[in-house]
C-alpha cells in the first residue's frame, strides 16, 4: 500500500508541474480536455494564409511564370535545394514535408510581428504567433522525430536500430539519449527565440513607443526567417542521417 501511494504521489507532482502556465490562456473545453483555443485560432489563420496565397498564385499556371507563380516556384526551388543538400539523392519524397515545416514556421513567426492580433479581444489571454506557444513547437519537433524514424525504418527495416550500437555498443545510452535531445533542442530553440523577440518588442514599445522599436522589429523579422530555415534544415539533416544510417 505504501509503495502504491509513493508511486502515485510523484505522478500527481508531475501533473501539477505540467499545469504551470506562463501568462493567461484562452481554453476550449472539449470533453474532458482543455485545449489552447488561441493557438488553434492563430494556426488556422496561418494555414488559411498559406492555402489562400498558393491558390491565388497558381489558379491559372503559365508556361513562363510571372508574379505570384514565379515567387512560389522560387520558394519551391529553394526548399528543394535545402532538402537535396541535407538528405541527398533520395530527397524528392521529403520535399513536401520540409516545405510544409518551413512555410508554416516562417509565416507563423512573421504573423507575430505583422498581423494585428491585439485587435481581436479574447475572454482570457491574447492572440500571438503560433510558434510563441511551446505546444506548437513541441508538436512540430515530434512530427520531425516521427519523420526521421519513419525514413530509417522504411529503408532499413528493423536493422535501422543497429545504429544505436555503432561504432561500439558502449555508446548505446548516448545514442538513445540523442533521439530525445533532438526534439527538445528543436522545440525549445524555436519557442525561446520567438518568445524572446516578441517580449523585447513589447517592452521597447511600452518604454519608447516611437522610432526605437522599429529597427528591433525588422531584426525580429530577419531572425524569425532564420529560425524557420534552421528548423527546416535540421529536420532535413536528421532525415538524411536516418537514410544514410550513420551520425
Swiss-Prot record:
It comes from the Eukaryota. GO terms for cellular component: chloroplast thylakoid membrane; plasma membrane; proton-transporting ATP synthase complex. The keyword Ion transport applies. InterPro entries: ATP_syn_F0_a_bact/chloroplast (IPR045082), ATP_synth_F0_asu (IPR000568), ATP_synth_F0_asu_AS (IPR023011), F0_ATP_A_sf (IPR035908). The keyword GTP-binding does not apply. Disulfide bonds: none annotated. It is a multi-pass membrane protein. Keywords: ATP synthesis, CF(0), Chloroplast, Hydrogen ion transport, Ion transport, Membrane, Plastid, Thylakoid, Transmembrane, Transmembrane helix, Transport. The chain crosses the membrane at residues 38-58, 95-115, 134-154, 199-219, 220-240. It is found in: Plastid, Chloroplast thylakoid membrane. One of its GO terms (molecular function) is proton-transporting ATP synthase activity, rotational mechanism. Belongs to the ATPase A chain family. F-type ATPases have 2 components, CF(1) - the catalytic core - and CF(0) - the membrane proton channel. CF(1) has five subunits: alpha(3), beta(3), gamma(1), delta(1), epsilon(1). CF(0) has four main subunits: a, b, b' and c. Key component of the proton channel; it plays a direct role in the translocation of protons across the membrane. This is ATP synthase subunit a, chloroplastic. It comes from Spinacia oleracea (Spinach).
